[in-house]
Structure formats: structure tokens, C-alpha cells
């Protein structure tokens, strides 16, 4: 019996450990560069402009177009800057109240009595009451910039971008990932684009390290929360 309790106690202690053994007593490691760019060539044939042709007998050269336009990301491998400025606030308050009462009474009488067993009555009452109250408040404020790489060009000219940024401060690693589809016309003259102009935007901001481990409940507590009926 003591052996069984000892095994259970040891299992709870081991599963309750919330530290990652890989990062134990060490700083979190960075991800390899270009590890999660997810570049996948498009199956649709792509067409790109041909290089300018030399014109030896003209004062105008097509290669001089770059002097009259701002450099912007247009081809796979080009880099652009994404400005992320999120300041959202939402408040939701729901309240419901349900109450129902019912009462019924039945009486049976025949005018005769045989040992006082013919006449009778039946009564019933029921009551039901339900109340619910829910409130959600959310506020997010994120301001940062991240460089993204053009990974593919769609047939209509839109660009698929993906970027990642990792910053390690002491024993905490902050990770920012962004991906989506942008139109070349939305890229500003300084090769920057706002996050709200990115279609299918996927923005992830989190981290791992000592602070993240402390904020998460231990594994044993999470397991008990899943199986506990109370």
C-alpha cells in the first residue's frame, strides 16, 4: 500500500514540474536563421520583367528608371519593414435571468364514499430559476517594427511575406512572427507597410524562458483541472 502511494506521489511531483529540462539552468536558444520562413514555390508559372536592353544611340536608358522611383520590395528575397501598431480595446457584458413557476391541482370526487376511499385530490408545484452573468474586458497595446522577406509572388502581383524576430533579454526570449499577403501599391516610398494593410495577416508575439514558465501553471495542476469534476 505504501509503495502504491509512493509511486503516485512521485508521479505527481514529476508531472508538476513546470520547467523545460532543455533550458534548465541555461538561457533559451535562438532558432536557426530562415528556419520558419516556410518558402514554397508557387505551382503557377511566374513571369518577371526582362532585363533592360542596351541602347547605344539614345540619350535615355531604361536602366535609369531606378533613379526615378523609390526602392520597394517586389521580388522574392526582397526585404521590407512592417509597422505593427495595435491598440485595441473591447468590452462585452451579457446578463440573463430566467424564472418559471407552475402549479396544478386535481380533485376527484364522485358524491359517494366507500370507506372514505373514493374521493381524492392531487396537487403539484414546480419552480425553475436560472441566472447568468458574463463580462469580458480586453485591452491590447503593441507597437513594434519587424523586417519581413518576400517569399513568393502571386500571379496577380501580390506579395507573400514572412518575417521573424527574436530578442533575448537575460533568461527570457521574446519571439515575433508575422506573415501575410500585401499589395505592392500599399508599400510606402520608404519600403514600409502598415500591419492593417496585410491580408490574411498572422501575427504572433510571445516568448519562452523563466518568466513564461512562471506564468504557466505546473503540468500537474493543469492535469487536475482537466480531470477534476469540480
Swiss-Prot record:
Q: Known InterPro entries for this protein? A: Flag_Lring (IPR000527)
Sites of N-palmitoyl cysteine lipid attachment are: 17
Lipid positions (S-diacylglycerol cysteine): 17
Role according to the record: Assembles around the rod to form the L-ring and probably protects the motor/basal body from shearing forces during rotation.
UniProtKB keywords? Bacterial flagellum, Cell outer membrane, Lipoprotein, Membrane, Palmitate, Signal
The protein's location, in the record's own words, is: Cell outer membrane; Bacterial flagellum basal body
Q: What organism does this protein naturally occur in?
A: Bartonella bacilliformis (strain ATCC 35685 / KC583 / Herrer 020/F12,63)
- Family listed: Belongs to the FlgH family.
Q: Which domain of life is it from?
A: Bacteria
What gene makes this protein?
Answer: flgH
Query: Quaternary form?
Result: The basal body constitutes a major portion of the flagellar organelle and consists of four rings (L,P,S, and M) mounted on a central rod.
GO MF term (any one): cytoskeletal motor activity
Q: Which residues form the signal peptide?
A: 1-16
One GO cellular component assignment for this chain's record is: bacterial-type flagellum basal body, distal rod, L ring
S-S bridge residues: none
Q: Does the keyword Metal-binding belong to this entry?
A: no
Q: How does it sit in the membrane?
A: Lipid-anchor
Q: Which GO terms describe its biological process?
A: bacterial-type flagellum-dependent cell motility
Q: What is this protein called?
A: Flagellar L-ring protein
Amino acid at each position: 500500500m505504501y509503495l502504491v502511494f509512493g509511486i503516485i506521489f512521485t508521479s505527481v511531483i514529476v508531472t508538476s514540474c513546470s520547467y523545460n529540462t532543455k533550458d534548465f539552468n541555461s538561457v533559451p536558444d535562438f532558432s536557426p536563421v530562415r528556419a520558419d520562413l516556410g518558402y514554397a514555390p508557387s505551382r503557377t508559372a511566374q513571369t518577371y520583367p526582362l532585363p533592360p536592353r542596351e541602347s547605344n544611340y539614345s540619350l535615355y536608358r531604361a536602366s535609369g528608371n531606378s533613379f526615378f522611383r523609390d526602392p520597394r520590395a517586389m521580388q522574392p528575397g526582397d526585404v521590407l519593414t512592417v509597422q505593427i501598431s495595435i491598440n485595441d480595446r473591447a468590452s462585452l457584458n451579457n446578463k440573463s435571468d430566467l424564472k418559471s413557476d407552475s402549479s396544478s391541482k386535481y380533485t376527484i370526487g364522485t358524491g359517494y364514499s366507500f370507506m372514505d376511499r373514493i374521493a381524492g385530490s392531487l396537487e403539484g408545484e414546480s419552480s425553475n430559476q436560472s441566472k447568468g452573468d458574463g463580462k469580458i474586458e480586453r485591452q491590447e497595446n503593441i507597437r513594434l517594427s519587424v523586417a519581413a522577406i518576400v517569399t513568393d509572388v502571386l500571379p496577380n502581383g501580390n506579395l507573400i511575406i514572412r518575417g521573424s524576430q527574436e530578442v533575448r533579454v537575460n533568461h527570457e526570449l521574446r519571439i515575433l512572427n508575422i506573415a501575410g499577403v500585401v499589395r505592392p501599391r500599399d508599400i510606402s516610398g520608404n519600403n514600409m507597410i502598415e500591419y492593417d494593410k496585410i491580408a490574411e495577416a498572422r501575427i504572433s508575439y510571445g516568448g519562452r524562458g523563466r518568466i513564461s514558465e512562471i506564468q504557466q501553471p505546473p503540468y500537474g495542476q493543469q492535469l487536475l483541472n482537466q480531470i477534476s469534476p469540480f
